[in-house]
Amino acid sequence: MGKLRIGFLTALLVLAGCREAATLTLADGEQQRLKDYRGEWLVVNYFAEWCAPCLRELPLLNELGQAAGPAVLAVSFDTMPAQALQAMQQRLAITIPVVTSLKGPWPFELPRVLPTTFVIDPDGKLAARHQGELRAEDIARWRENYWGNKGGS
């Protein structure tokens, strides 16, 4: 019975180690992992070119991405080749990295509403979700509650 239990536990550990990592692909083809952002706050925004509220909030996200604080990623809901996505990024003046795909176990589900923004804490866990257009006061509240004076990156 002891050997069977040890064998079972060993198999579980092996399978746990095989679990797919949370990864992303940027519009320029660069591959990254969620764990690359460990130790810092991460804001992940889902947008689409046809979504008017998404386009209105892009300047706020660009500004947030340039400020000291969280890393910011924009995930395109539009399915298009990388070259077209890069052209859209230039056309819309998106200065934050644009993601073409997310794979593996992310700490949130695919949004049902656009725009949707997720705040991921330095441990890789979901801290906040915002459905609908972001406003400056939403970001100010996150700054105060998450990555501002309370630590974080």
Predicted regions and their residues:
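Sec-dependent bacterial lipoprotein signal peptides
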Residues: 1-18
